[in-house]
Amino acid sequence: MRLFCCCLGLVMMSPLSVLGQQAPAKPGDAAPPATPLPTGPPLSDDDKANQLSDQVGKLMVKCVNLLTAQDPLSLDYCKQQRDLADQYPPHMRMLDKMMAHDEYGIALAAFDHKQEALEEFDREVALVPKAVKPGSAEWSTAYWHRAMIYTQMGQMDKADRDYRAAEENFRKPAPTAESASIDRKRRTILRQHAALLEKEGKPEAAHQLLQEASK
């Protein structure tokens, strides 16, 4: 399931500080439950993963579309996506699992559920070494999103640590050719970290990051 690469571009580049200003979800809002997997003889791990992948992909599209539209229903669809992705057999579709936690974390942050969002980003970061290669954009994105939620929560030391982890990863050789969108993301991370350092009274360190972002 690689559809997320195009669908999530806009959402992943949106600052969580902006998303977090949306209206809280209404108590009665709920998405219909996900379709249960068909019953029958036990499935092989591959067959189970393939069946789950189809549902996870459909929920991902709904999750991202509703989140982009700032619709509170995104919380339910993103949660269903996360819950189904967690049912993949161990060590299979790790990137799908990782992205499901990321998207649900973004949805929670969008509607001001900061602590719950942090828990999702914690789970995402824990999956990173199993799901993606060093130097990949997804590796940096996981730390970047957690850095932003730490910033919202006023935990600046932890935010600084995660920004550094995201930047350090981007300085490693990329496993695939770097696209313009990935380069924009790298620059965004550097500039956000520079802004944090400036507020923390570290202008020289902030200036170094801004210089790197300009390259």
Indicate where each model-derived feature is located.
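N-terminal leader/linker segments that initiate helical-solenoid repeat arrays
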Residues: 20-79
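Flexible helix-coil transition and linker loops at the boundaries of alpha-helical arrays
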Residues: 44-50, 83-95, 127-135, 171-182
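Structural motif corresponding to the intra-repeat A-B loop/turn of tetratricopeptide repeats
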Residues: 68-69, 111, 153, 200
